[in-house]
Structures are given as C-alpha cells and as structure tokens.
UniProtKB/Swiss-Prot annotation:
Gene3D superfamilies (UniProt xref): Anthranilate synthase
Annotated family: Belongs to the anthranilate synthase component I family.
Alphabetical keyword list: Amino-acid biosynthesis, Aromatic amino acid biosynthesis, Lyase, Magnesium, Metal-binding, Plasmid, Tryptophan biosynthesis
Binding, Mg(2+): E363, E500
Organism listed in the record: Buchnera aphidicola subsp. Diuraphis noxia
Cofactor, free-text remark: Binds 1 Mg(2+) ion per subunit.
Name used for this protein in its record: Anthranilate synthase component 1
EC number(s) per entry: 4.1.3.27
Length: 519
C-alpha cells in the first residue's frame, strides 16, 4: 500500500545581490561536484534575466545505459527519498539496492507500437514521475522540486531502435540533480534568494540544511574572489576526429542520398579536441564574447559541460499548457569594418542575402515543418501554429534565421512526454528525423554524448525549459570536446558547409584558448 505524499518543507532566505553569477558560482561552489549554473538573457539587448544555481543536490539521477537509472543520495535529505522509493516501487520496476543508491531497470520498449501506446509505455522518464508522485508541494512554491541537468543526444536510443555506437565519453544518457539548495538571482529586480528544499522530517537534517542556508547568506555578504587564472597547458594543439577532407566526403555521400529521395536534410557533425584545465574561466570568456539566451555550466563528478546556446530545445509552461519549439537554421557573420566595428549597411545587406537565399530558406522551412509535425503528435487538435516565421536574431558575431512553433499540450500528457516525443531536435538531426539519425550514426560511428541533446530544468509544478546543447564544450580528464555540424540539403555546397561547421566551433575554441592564455 502506497503512503500518502510527504509534504516538502521550503526554507527561503534573502541574500545580497551580485551582478556576476559566474563569480558567485566560483565563490560558493568552487570545484564542488553535482553543481549547476543556468543563465538566461534577452536575445536583442543581451541583458541578463535570471540565473539559477544548484549549490547542493539531494540526489544525482543518471542513466548510464539503456533502460537503466541510477539514483544516488548526496545527503541524508536525499536518502529519505530513496527510502520512500524502496518501499513503494518494488512491484513497478526491477530494483537493485545499495547503501546510498538504487538502480532501477525498466523494460525495453516494444517494437511496432502505435504512437499513442508508445508515449504511455513505462520508460526511464517515469523515475522522475515516481519521485514527484510521493511528494506534495501544498503551497505551489516555484522550484520546490527542481531537477536541473542534461539530456544527451543518445538518450533517443531508449525510445527508438537505432544502431549501437561506440561510447568514447562517460557522458550518461541523462544526468539530473534534484536541488537541495538553490540560489535564484533575478537580474532585472536585482534580488537574490536562497531556497532549501527538505524531503525529510528528520530534525537534525533540517538543522543542517538551515545552517547551510545561513552559511551561503554569510558568504554572499563578503567580497567575492575573482576566478583564479591557472598556468598555461603544456600541449595546446587543436585536433579533430576527422579532417576537412573526410568531413567534406561525408557531406557529399549524404547529398547522394538526398538526391535519391531517402532524406530531405541531415546534420552531420565532427569533434574538435583541446586541453582545458580551467573550464569556469573558459565559460566566463565565452559568456563575454558570445552572450546568448541560454548559458550553462554543469560540474559533474565525471565531466564538466559549459556553453552559450542560441537555441531553445523544448519549453513548456504548465499554467497555460503551451509547448514551444524554436528552430534555428541559417547563419551569417555580422557585417563589420576592418577595425571590428559594426557596419550597419553591410550588416543589413548580409541579412537581406540570408533572408532571400533559396538554400537557407529551403532548409529553414523544412525544419519549421518538422517542428509542426513533432507538436502535432502531442498537442490538442487545432492548437498548433507558427507564431514567428523566418525572423532574424542577431548576436555579437553572427545572425540566425529563427521561427517559433507553439501548441497546447494534450491534457493527459506532461512535459517529459513532450520531450520524449520531440527529441532530438530537427535542427541537429534532419528530416525525416529517424532516418536522418540512422545515417548520422552510420557516418559518425560514435555516440554524440551531450552535443545535440538538451540542458535545462523541469519542476514538480510541470514546467520545463531547455536549450539545445550547442556552442558548448564537454570536458573530461582536462580535454574539451567541441562538436559542431552543418545542415545539409540538396543544393548545399560541401566546402561552404565545412567552413560553417568550423565557424560554429570557433567561438568556444577561442574562449578556451583565451582562458588558458594560448592566444
């Protein structure tokens, strides 16, 4: 018999506001693992909007292999969640119990299920639903249960039958932290809030968590230290997993399949490697040189992931039940004079050329259509529409063609159903999506890991906000992997697509090089 949901206790404290969240993160978290910084900014003005930090996590929830989830308690607070799961899930999934962790094994998906049955099949995403089911947020406090982290590109193999690929990194299929201590910074109001979530009635644990909140409050009253500059790395050579010629050859082979009508579009990618012993400093450089709507720094026990992404993945607002996709396809450099200043006339001519380029428009409209199809599967009939079509977003160094597709999520579905139905985003795969992903697997021959997945958060109130993991670096054993791709259509020029892929990676590469004094 299942117990009644346990009520979450929320402890909130106001704290001193600081404008630079990267320095705050360094000051509070340092090299502490299972920490996360998420930032949002306005597209046009590039003003910071909100920063959210997971300073302490109660649980680390990860899927290291298909249909398997590992839940590890990081505090007594988290251990209570595991004890509740242990006594309530035995009949639902296979469970393997250790001292401070649980492994859940889920059934493999059945082949040839229709879409409706498939979306409701038991899956690794039900791990989060189980946790949320056993806890009650009576006062509807925002972010009371806050799951922040990463969906990898390869997560799709839990939901679709795709070729098995070589795993070259420790990056899990997903990795999320359930926040115990959050720092919520509103840059418009210049406020800072410490929020602790208690998932246990243990008085000693409550005292510990309250003390932790006071410690952070006190730390924020002190002057903040700048991010330390580390010594230069010895081997600074940039390498790649394939040459320009090899990448160009793959593009040409995929174009043959496009001409045969097997696919309409595909997004092959390649990896660049660079030593990176100071990821937070590199992230700070990237933020300054390339401010973006979504910026993130994730510090896990196995890896560090940071980036500045221009592209929303999937966004869902439970209040309105609106689900949103934001395809970006079409990129040009900003028009600048020789001295680096903006040339408004040149900039407008570059924008006009991009807006009227047949190849760019064909690629972009295919992806808008793909987004419409993705939402049609999960939205109420007649609610899906294109709210913005072929708009231009401008950043310091590049401009993009963007559109926005929205709809009303069916009442029986939640944000995780929506993400499962829409991943991976068409701008990182192609169309038709499944065949494009099969071809990507065939030609790239190894897992993508974080690249092309999504990073962000979802909450017990049902909201979800994620961005596509691009313009990013995945750092493992002090080596950064920077991955970039190009959208290939019938009339793409392979040599131009090679250059576009390099240009996309350059901003992150330059940030790492500047942080380590390599340039």
């Amino acid at each position: 018999m299942e117990k009644k949901p346990y009520e979450i206790k929320i402890i909130q404290k106001k704290a001193k506001y600081h404008p630079d969240p990267t320095i705050v993160f360094n000051h509070i978290c340092g090299s502490q693992k299972q920490t996360l910084l998420l930032e949002t900014a306005e597209i046009n003005k590039k003003n910071d909007l909100e920063s959210i930090m997971i300073i302490d996590a109660a649980l680390r929830i990860s899927s290291e292999r298909n249909h398997s989830v590992q839940l590890t308690a990081l505090s007594k607070n988290g251990e209570n969640i595991l004890s509740i799961l242990k006594s309530n899930l035995k009949q639902k999934v296979q469970m393997f119990i250790q001292d401070t962790s649980i492994r859940l094994e889920f059934p493999h998906f059945q082949k040839n299920l229709d879409e409706d049955k498939k979306i409701f099949s038991l899956s690794i995403f039900d791990t989060f639903r189980f946790i949320m089911k056993f806890f009650k947020n009576r006062n509807k406090v925002q972010k009371a249960m806050f799951f922040g982290g990463l969906f990898s590109y390869d997560l799709i193999s839990n939901f679709e039958l795709l070729p098995k690929l070589k795993k070259t990194q420790k990056c899990p299929h997903f990795c999320f932290y359930l926040a115990e201590t959050l720092l919520i910074v509103d840059h418009q109001k210049k406020t800072c809030l410490i929020q602790n979530s208690l998932f246990t009635k243990n008085s000693h644990e409550q005292m510990r968590v309250e003390k932790r909140g006071r410690e952070i409050q006190k730390k924020l009253e002190a002057s903040l230290n700048s991010i330390p500059v580390r010594q230069e790395v010895k081997n600074s050579m940039l390498t790649a997993n394939m040459s320009d010629e090899q990448y160009c050859s793959i593009i040409k082979k995929l174009q043959i399949l496009i001409r045969k009508g097997e696919i309409f579009q595909v997004v092959p990618s390649r990896k660049f490697f660079l030593p990176c012993s100071n990821p937070l400093s590199a992230y700070q450089k990237l933020k300054k040189s390339n401010p973006s709507p979504y910026m993130f720094f994730m510090q896990d026990k196995d890896f560090t992931l940071f980036g500045a992404s221009p592209e929303s993945s999937l966004k869902y607002d439970d209040t309105t039940r609106q689900v949103e996709l934001y395809p970006i396809a079409g990129t040009r450099p900003r028009g600048r004079n020789m001295d680096g200043t903006l040339n408004l006339d040149l900039d407008s001519r570059i924008e006009l050329e991009m807006r009227t380029n047949h190849k760019e428009l064909a690629e972009h409209l295919m992806l808008v259509d793909l987004a419409r199809n993705d939402l049609a599967r999960i939205c109420e009939p007649g609610s899906r529409y294109v709210s913005d079509l072929v708009r231009v977003d401008k950043y310091p160094h590049v401009m993009h063609l963007v559109s926005r597709v929205v709809g009303t999520l069916k009442p029986e579905l939640d944000a995780l159903h929506a993400y499962a139905a829409c991943m991976n985003m068409g701008t990182l795969t192609g169309a038709p999506k499944i065949r494009a992903m099969e071809l990507i697997a065939e030609y790239e021959m190894e897992q993508r890991g974080s690249y092309g997945g999504a990073i962000g958060y979802f909450t017990d109130l049902g909201n979800l906000d994620t961005c596509i993991t691009i313009r990013s670096a995945y750092v493992e054993d002090n080596i950064a992997t920077i991955q970039s791709g190009s959208g290939i259509v019938y009339n793409s020029i392979p040599e131009d697509e090679v250059k576009e892929g390099i240009n996309k990676a350059k901003r992150v590469i330059n940030a790492i090089q500047h942080a380590h004094h390599l340039v």
